[in-house]
Amino acid sequence: VGFKAGVKDYKLTYYTPEYNPKDTDILAAFRVTPQPGVPAEEAGAAVAAESSTGTWTTVWTDGLTSLDRYKGRCYDIEPVAGEESQFIAYVAYPLDLFEEGSVTNMFTSIVGNVFGFKALXXLRLEDLRIPPAYSKTFQGPPHGIQVERDKLNKYGRPLLGCTIKPKLGLSAKNYGRAVYECLRGGLDFTKDDENVNSQPFMRWRDRFLFCAEAIYKAQAETGEIKGHYLNATAGTCEEMMKRAIFARELGVPIVMHDYLTGGFTANTSLARYCRDNGLLLHIHRAMHAVIDRQKNHGMHFRVLAKALRMSGGDHIHAGTVVGKLEGERDITLGFVDLLRDDFVEKDRSRGIYFTQDWVSLPGVIPVASGGIHVWHMPALTEIFGDDSVLQFGGGTLGHPWGNAPGAVANRVALEACVQARNEGRDLAREGNEIIRSAAKWSPELAAACEVWKEIKFEFPAMDTL
């Protein structure tokens, strides 16, 4: 017999510290917490094995293939500062293990069964290096940042959005009215809540019609291009495509998808349709915290963000950073760069484990959304820069005078911040002053400032990084 039966140590085959990763390999950084008594090399090798060619015992069919060509390799192990029980395992996967153009297949391998592996107490995928040889098999975002600006004819400032609330319970007619008021007041976009699909109180087709009417009415009155993220997410791919096609027939500029609950297969199909039919695609990340919230198990959001850039989306929600801790801010900006930029250098202080070259794959605009209002505007402008969407749901609709004045307040605050920045003022230090002086000539902004009161900026100026 040409092989020895029985259970074997993974590290004999899958731990290869002398290996030099190839340019075409997909590289992964895992945070591994092994069970007590399992050595780091064995645990790292087990991760490499179980997420590639390995199984728990030797099988005779191993002899029918070239393991050296197809196996994942744990090529480096480094300790985690301050964590005795954890380490980072670096694994290289040969490109041939993955189907071209399929995020679904990539994740099934890399974050599949291995996460239930008994020898590990916990496992977290911190980052992935996607080689150009693989990213080039994806279409990526339907349009990207520059094409979106050209389509909307909006330059030199962040875009403004608003999620329509209450998210569940409005009739289609009243929903459309709320959309119209926000767009008329000065927002660029309004948004279907991620929960809004097609429920008994408001079927999707009625919503699409009334929102389209709102868009065209607001465009005619303001002379600006407007959009509403029509949520095409549905229970089946066929139904999702039907909704996207109807949106295209209405002539609206943008649709929306919940990419994690809807799934990568559905998302990639929708992104391809959007590219072919001139629709922008807004992506919501509902369910991300189930995957990325725990620090020692699951998958960091930067991996989900990279996966979305490959699968396709023009906007994606990326948290707000405002008022959070400094370290968290650097890490958020790290994956914001991974979404927008063409080339991102390795920088462990920002959580970026690998240098990532996207070779001209279009970028994705990060969306800051959740609990923000006019007083946050200077910080948001400073942190996210021009290529972002700032989304104020309650921060628009919660205005004491109604939706349109709420939209006016946000637009005035944004224009004031952009002007101040362009004049060379320091938004981080003078933020409250900029908003206060703008409020003197905008009663809508003054009223908004009253309701939400000034916030404390918990961080110093940007240039101290």
UniProtKB/Swiss-Prot annotation:
Classification via Pfam families: RuBisCO_large (PF00016), RuBisCO_large_N (PF02788)
GO CC field: chloroplast
Keywords tagged on the record: Calvin cycle, Carbon dioxide fixation, Chloroplast, Disulfide bond, Lyase, Magnesium, Metal-binding, Methylation, Monooxygenase, Oxidoreductase, Photorespiration, Photosynthesis, Plastid
GO MF annotation: an example: magnesium ion binding
Endpoints of the signal sequence: none
List of residues that carry N6-carboxylysine: K191
Subunit structure comment from the entry: Heterohexadecamer of 8 large chains and 8 small chains; disulfide-linked. The disulfide link is formed within the large subunit homodimers.
NCBIfam families reported for this sequence: PRK04208.1 (NF003252)
Record protein name field: Ribulose bisphosphate carboxylase large chain
